[in-house]
A protein has these predicted regions:
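Hydrophobic helical h-region of N-terminal Sec-dependent signal peptides
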Residues: 9-11
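Extracellular glycan-interacting surfaces
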Residues: 2-5, 15-280
């Protein structure tokens, strides 16, 4: 357990740092900037988007990644909430003049071409964002607290936990899971309080699709799935690489970004193929 905590802490530090193998080798190489991914989301047209240290990238199958728009923020948090509708957080790009160091909650309604501020500018740096049931859940790295808003403007501060990732139940707005260095935590009161979940693997990243199993990944790249909201877990596939982000899109589709590339599964993480391969 002690060694697992050390590995968890090391990977967590990499995931939170602002500067900072699959079955098939057919993935394409990436342009500069894509190799540090903080969040992914699948748009309604089936195209994968990734929020990175150097902006948002569009990753269409059989095409090279494309930087979207002219805004090159450091996206520490990124999620797709609807067709061409994204939310993000992090730090402003080098070309952003007179902008506070923390972006708070920002939003794009044109597929990432432009972004505008919604709230918490200069105050919050959300390293995990989840949109469920008309609510935005954010994990603020500065205060180590989960925050919730119903109107994207007025935020309510909930439990303070040393978490790396959070995931909200697609069926219960009160059900929230969080990964920590001491194990998986569960909330049944919309992140006001958390309790440990017994006998779970040392998960660091989570993704909870509208349909299909909850997906979790360990710091060493072992993919797990849960059919009962995180109570029990089944090992699926060992990628053997350090994970950066995961997106479980439902209908068996799972994307995992690691330090070596992006992997794609069509069977809920049982097998994977290379989607994109990062330059060495």
């Amino acid at each position: 357990m002690h060694s697992a905590l050390i590995i968890f802490s090391a990977v967590a530090a990499l995931l939170s740092g602002a500067c900072s193998s699959a079955d098939s080798p057919s993935g394409r190489s990436n342009p500069s900037g894509l190799a540090h991914i903080h969040g992914m989301g699948l748009d309604s047209d089936g195209v994968l988007y990734a929020g990175t240290h150097y902006g948002v990238y569009r990753l269409a199958r059989e095409r090279n990644p494309e930087l979207v728009g002219d805004v090159v923020h450091d996206f520490m948090g990124f999620t797709v909430v609807g067709p061409n509708h994204f939310m993000g957080s992090g730090h402003p790009g080098a070309d952003s003049d007179d902008t506070p160091p923390n972006l708070g909650l920002i939003e794009s309604t044109d597929g990432g071409q432009t972004w505008h501020s919604l709230s918490m500018t200069g105050e919050a740096d959300f390293h995990s964002l989840d949109y469920r049931h008309g609510l935005v859940f954010g994990l603020d790295s500065g205060t180590r607290s989960v925050m919730v808003t119903a109107d994207k403007k007025t935020w309510y501060r909930r439990a303070e936990i040393s978490a790396v990732d959070i995931a909200v139940s697609p069926t219960d707005p009160n059900g929230v899971l969080a990964t920590t260095g001491t194990g998986l935590l569960r909330s049944v009161d919309q992140a006001k309080t958390f309790t440990p979940v017994a006998d779970t693997p040392p998960l660091i990243l989570l993704s909870w699709p509208d349909e299909g199993p909850l997906i979790g990944i360990t710091p060493t790249g072992m993919v797990y799935a849960s059919q009962d909201a995180g109570t029990t877990w089944q090992a699926r596939r060992d990628l053997g690489e350090r994970p950066q982000a995961v997106e479980a899109a439902g209908r068996g589709l799972v994307f995992v970004a690691t330090d070596r590339g992006i992997h794609r599964s069509t069977d809920n993480g049982t097998t994977f193929e290379a989607f994109y391969t990062f330059d060495a």
